[in-house]
Swiss-Prot record:
Alphabetized NCBIfam families for the sequence: DNA_bind_WhiA (TIGR00647)
Keywords of this entry: Cell cycle, Cell division, DNA-binding
Entry keyword annotation includes Transmembrane helix: no
Protein name listed in UniProt: Probable cell division protein WhiA
Gene (name only): whiA
Family recorded in the similarity comment: Belongs to the WhiA family.
Length: 326
């Protein structure tokens, strides 16, 4: 199963009890996967999904939340599109559902972005809207240089609305047009993990992070193989190990970290191959390498103490045999 399929399978199983969140998810799914059609003078809603479980989830929600009947039509894959597609269609009361979900405004005009009730919703409903958009037209690529979480959008207004929703969750995303198709893209690895966690794809996050770390370690090992100087190899491995420990320290401490230690830790994470002296030069104001080392040491000590108090794995637990082979 691909990463995208795994994420959608997990998201389609997320239990949501809050009615407003279920409405936000349905609205977003219909907006990003669907369309309004006029057939024999009646408005018909269709939403095309690539996962059968997502189609069933949408059908159940339409029935339970709005009381409307829908059908699922299976469209077999062809030369251009491999794999089956699942079309959820609402024929009877299509106009009523379109108004209820915000696809049509009070004057009966199609809404081009996201419905107002979704745009101004609570954080929980905003998360639900993102989940619906991803189930509709989302994808996740393997960790690497071009790794990204993307959602294909029906238009620029919907893309900007989704970017705004991500911003409300503290996640940076970008709207861009590629070959005439509007997309919302998240490229930062930590941001990808954050949005997946928010949406409820916890198992997928673990799998993605494992592949991401494996790739980083492999990439570092490849670079180390080209080093002629043994001391340089040891320094680089030590820097990678320190970066891994700092990342674990931030997970343990969460918000409870003094600013000057946060800054030192971020410098280490953002410059994994840099020496302590180089990190000191990158600091504002500049620091000596001993000052940088001292701050990172205090950060790790704080995290290890808290981990010991809580009975959870400390910063050294994240180290792999490759990192320890100094």
């Amino acid at each position: 199963m691909s990463l995208t399929a795994a994420v959608k399978d997990e998201l389609a199983r997320v239990r949501v009890d809050k009615i407003s969140s279920r409405k936000a998810e349905v609205s977003a799914t219909l907006r990003f996967a669907g369309g309004l059609h006029i057939i024999s003078g009646r408005i018909v809603i269709e939403a095309e999904l690539d996962a059968a479980i997502a189609a069933r989830r949408l059908r159940v929600a339409i029935a339970e939340v709005y009381g409307h009947v829908s059908d699922i039509i299976v469209v077999s894959g062809g030369a251009l599109r491999k794999g089956n597609r699942y079309v959820v269609r609402v024929v009877r009361d299509g106009e009523a559902l379109a108004r209820q979900t915000g696809l049509l405004d009070s004057r009966g005009r199609p809404v081009r972005g996201l419905p107002p009730q979704v745009v101004s919703a609570s954080i929980g409903d905003t998360v639900a809207a993102w989940r619906g958009a991803f189930l509709a037209h989302g994808s996740l690529t393997e960790p690497g240089r071009s790794s990204a979480l993307e959602v294909t959008c029906p238009g620029p207004e919907a893309a900007l609305a989704l970017v705004g929703a991500a911003r409300r969750l503290g996640i940076t995303s970008k709207a861009r047009e590629v070959r005439g198709v509007d997309r919302v893209v998240i490229r930062d690895g930590d941001a990808i993990s954050a949005i997946l966690t928010r949406m409820g794809a916890h198992d997928a996050v673990l799998a993605w992070e494992e592949r991401r770390m494996r790739r980083e370690v492999r990439g570092t090992a490849n670079r180390l193989a080209n080093f002629d100087d043994a001391n340089l190899r040891r320094s680089a491995r030590a820097a990678v190990a320190a970066s891994a420990r700092v990342e674990r320290a931030f997970e343990i401490l969460a918000e409870d970290v003094p600013d000057h230690l946060v800054e030192a830790g971020r410098l280490r994470l953002e410059n994994k191959q840099a020496s302590l002296e180089e990190l000191g030069q990158l600091s504002d104001p500049p620091l000596t390498k001993d000052a940088v080392a001292g701050r990172i040491r205090r950060l790790l000590a704080m995290a290890d103490k808290k981990a010991s108090d809580l009975g959870i794995p400390d910063t050294e637990s994240i180290l792999t045999p490759e990192m320890l082979d100094l």
